[in-house]
C-alpha cells in the first residue's frame, strides 16, 4: 500500500504521502516504522548444548516440563527454546523415517529386470535376405554361360561366360568402324548398333538383326584377341548385364574431340575408335574386336534383346552423342544406373 501511494503519478503534494515520507517531513512525530511483529533472533546451539539435548531425546521424545527446565538450566537457555528444539527434533526424526521407508520401496523396483529388454536370441531369429540379383543380369550370365562351345573358336571370350556376372562395362558407344565384308551385308553396323537394333525391335524400334549361328571377326586388320585374364582388369566397376551405357561409356572414356567424328546408322564412316568390344549372347554369339593401340575395353556380354526382359531396360541417349541408330522412341528410354 505504501509503495502504491508512492508510485501514484497523480498524487498532489502532501496528499499521497505515506508513512516513511511523513517521517521525513515530521521527524518529531513518532510513527511506527515497522508495523510487523519483531522476529526473534535465531538461536544457535553449541556442541555441548546439542549433546545434552540429544542425550535427553534418546531417553524420551516427549520430555515433561520438569525435564525441560532441568536441561534449560544445564545449557543456560530458556525452557521455551528447549521445548521448540524437541519439537523440531521430533519433526526431523519423522522426516527421516519417511525417507527411509520410501527408499526401501523404490530399491526393489529398481532391481526388477526391465521388461523392454529382449533376449539376444530374438534378434538373431530374423534372417537377412540379400537383395535379389536383377533378372537382366542373371539372364545375361545364364545366356552367356549356355553356349561356351560357340565362344571357344574366337579369341575374344566373354569374361562372364562363367555362371556369375563379372563386373565389366559395356563400352561400345559411338563406334563406326570399317564396314563389314560383302559376305555379311547385314552386319555393317558395329556391335553396339546390332545390339541396339535388337533392343529397339523389342520396343518397336527400327530393325531386327537376324541371328548368325557362327561367330565372326569384322575387319580382320583390326581384330585382336585379348585373353580372359585381363578382361576383368579393365574398368571393373560396372555390370553390363543390368544396363547398357553406349553413350555414357563413350563420354567418360574418350575425349570430346571424338564426338565430332560420330556417325549415324545411315552414314557409317571409316573412322573407328580403339574399342575392344566383346559381345556374347545366348542366341547371337558374335564377337568383334576393334583393338587399337590406345585403350582396350573389357569384353562384355549383352543379352538377346528380343526377349521380354529388354522391355524393362531403358536407355536415355543424349542428342549430342547420338550414333549408330535413329532412336525414334527417345522419350520411352531411360538410362538406369545401379
UniProtKB/Swiss-Prot annotation:
InterPro entries associated with the record: HD, Homeobox_CS, Homeodomain-like_sf, Otx_TF, Otx_TF_C
Alphabetized SMART domains for the sequence: HOX
The terms describing its cellular component in GO are: nucleus
Q: Where is the composition biased (Polar residues)?
A: 94-103
Keywords (A to Z) from UniProt? Developmental protein, DNA-binding, Homeobox, Nucleus
Positions of the DNA-binding region: 38-97
The segment annotated Disordered runs over 91-206, 261-290
Identify the CDD domains for this entry: homeodomain
Q: Which residues cross the membrane?
A: none
Tissue-wise expression? Embryonic expression is highly dynamic. Detected along the marginal zone of symmetric embryos at 5 hours of development and found at the shield, a primary morphological asymmetry at 6 hours of development. With the extension of the body axis, expression extends to neuroectodermal regions fated to become fore- and mid-brain; found in two stripes at the posterior side of the eye rudiments at 12 hours of development, distributed in the diencephalon, midbrain and the epiphysis at 18 hours of development, and found in the diencephalon and the midbrain at 24 hours of development.
Enumerate composition-biased segments (Pro residues). Answer: 174-188
Q: Where in the cell is it found?
A: Nucleus
UniProt GO MF annotations? DNA-binding transcription factor activity, RNA polymerase II-specific; RNA polymerase II cis-regulatory region sequence-specific DNA binding
Positions with biased composition (Low complexity) = 116-126, 134-173
Entry keyword annotation includes DNA-binding = yes
Instruction: Enumerate the Gene3D superfamilies for this protein.
Output: Homeodomain-like
* GO biological process terms held by the UniProt record: cerebellum development; hindbrain development; midbrain development; midbrain-hindbrain boundary development; regulation of transcription by RNA polymerase II; retinal pigment epithelium development
The task this protein performs is described as: Plays a role in very early embryogenesis, gastrulation, and the development and subdivision of the diencephalon and the midbrain. Establishes and positions the zona limitans intrathalamica (ZLI) in the diencephalon. May play a role in the organizer function. Probably acts redundantly with otx2 in early brain development.
Membership in a protein family: Belongs to the paired homeobox family. Bicoid subfamily.
**Under which name does UniProt file this protein?**
Homeobox protein OTX1 A
User: Whose protein is this, by species?
Assistant: Danio rerio
Gene that specifies this protein = otx1a
